[in-house]
């Protein structure tokens, strides 16, 4: 088991409970899709896992260790084992592709090396190899500001893999992409989950994508899990009755 959430709850200052007693596990190589409308709690849950938001109740257990109270070096070590893929890419637009990929190892190298761009030959070789893996080697020295959304997200995937993560957290990774680019990005994520045995937690609005690429789906409604099962068991009745009704939106629920 890579990750376990036990009774995670979070209440925002407005008084709305964004998460209510969330519990689940995810295994190595498993792709778990989190679905639900905006405000359902998807992004809050991902932020609690990465300690960008502190839950009010419950435990997050990663590789058998409770991470709720980790601080300083231990918290950085924990985060270095988790790759992040963002809806808005979170790239440095003025830098080229390989420089952005190299940023993926900043959490595991001395801060002075990162600040000065002092990467080892091994790190550089790994960055180029990852760009090749996602079909972006020919754009290695191109500024990211000149690339398409799909190309930027592929660089985002390579950057996340730079730290050799045990877990990928993907916050709406295809929300800004066209259908073809979306399929390309999800194919790469699935490929790495299978070939590198990386657990992947992906929040999605696109139901068909969740059914096609996920091994398992969890649906949230108003901060509660209303479905947890395999894609084939998620029928229209469950969708309309349990998932896409009575969702309240709160300013606390944001993308990562």
Curated annotation (Swiss-Prot):
PANTHER family referenced in this protein's UniProt entry, alphabetically: AMINO ACID IMPORT ATP-BINDING PROTEIN (PTHR43166), PHOSPHONATES IMPORT ATP-BINDING PROTEIN PHNC (PTHR43166:SF6)
Quaternary context: The complex is composed of two ATP-binding proteins (PhnC), two transmembrane proteins (PhnE) and a solute-binding protein (PhnD).
Domain ABC transporter: 3-247
Source organism, top-level taxon: Bacteria
Record membrane topology: Peripheral membrane protein
SMART domains: AAA
The protein's Enzyme Commission number: 7.3.2.2
Protein name listed in UniProt: Phosphonates import ATP-binding protein PhnC
InterPro entries reported in the protein's UniProt record: AAA+_ATPase, ABC_transporter-like_ATP-bd, ABC_transporter-like_CS, ABC_transpr_PhnC, MetN_ABC_transporter-like, P-loop_NTPase
Origin organism lineage: Bacteria, Pseudomonadati, Spirochaetota, Spirochaetia, Spirochaetales
Amino acids binding ATP: 36-43
A single MF term (Gene Ontology): ABC-type phosphonate transporter activity
Subcellular location(s) of the protein: Cell inner membrane
Annotated organism of origin: Treponema denticola (strain ATCC 35405 / DSM 14222 / CIP 103919 / JCM 8153 / KCTC 15104)
Function: Part of the ABC transporter complex PhnCDE involved in phosphonates import. Responsible for energy coupling to the transport system.
Cellular component, GO annotation: plasma membrane
The family this protein is said to belong to: Belongs to the ABC transporter superfamily. Phosphonates importer (TC 3.A.1.9.1) family.
Substrates-to-products reaction catalysed: phosphonate(out) + ATP + H2O = phosphonate(in) + ADP + phosphate + H(+)
């Amino acid at each position: 088991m890579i990750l376990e959430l036990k009774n995670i709850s979070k209440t925002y200052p407005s008084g709305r409970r964004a998460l209510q007693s969330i519990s689940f596990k995810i295994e190595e190589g498993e792709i778990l899709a989190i679905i639900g409308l905006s405000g359902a709690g998807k992004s809050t849950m991902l932020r609690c896992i990465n300690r960008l938001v502190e839950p009010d109740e419950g435990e997050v257990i990663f590789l058998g260790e409770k991470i709720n109270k980790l601080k300083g070096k231990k918290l950085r070590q924990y985060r270095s084992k988790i790759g992040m893929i963002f809806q808005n890419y979170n790239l440095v637009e003025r830098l080229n592709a390989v420089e952005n990929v190299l940023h993926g190892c900043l959490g595991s190298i001395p801060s002075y090396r990162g600040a000065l761009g002092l990467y080892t030959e091994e790190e550089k070789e790994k960055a180029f190899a990852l760009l090749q893996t996602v079909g972006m080697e020919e754009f290695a020295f191109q500024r990211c500001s000149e690339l398409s959304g799909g190309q930027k997200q592929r660089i985002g995937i390579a950057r996340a893999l730079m730290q050799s993560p045990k877990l990928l957290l993907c916050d709406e990774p295809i929300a800004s992409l066209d259908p073809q680019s979306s399929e390309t990005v999800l194919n790469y994520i699935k490929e790495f989950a299978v070939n590198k045995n990386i657990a992947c937690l992906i929040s999605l609005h696109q139901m068909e994508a969740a059914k096609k690429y996920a091994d398992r789906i969890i649906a949230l409604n108003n901060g509660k899990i209303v479905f947890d099962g395999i894609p084939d068991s998620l029928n229209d009745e469950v969708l309309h009755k349990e998932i896409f009704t009575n969702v309240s939106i709160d300013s606390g629920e944001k993308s990562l």
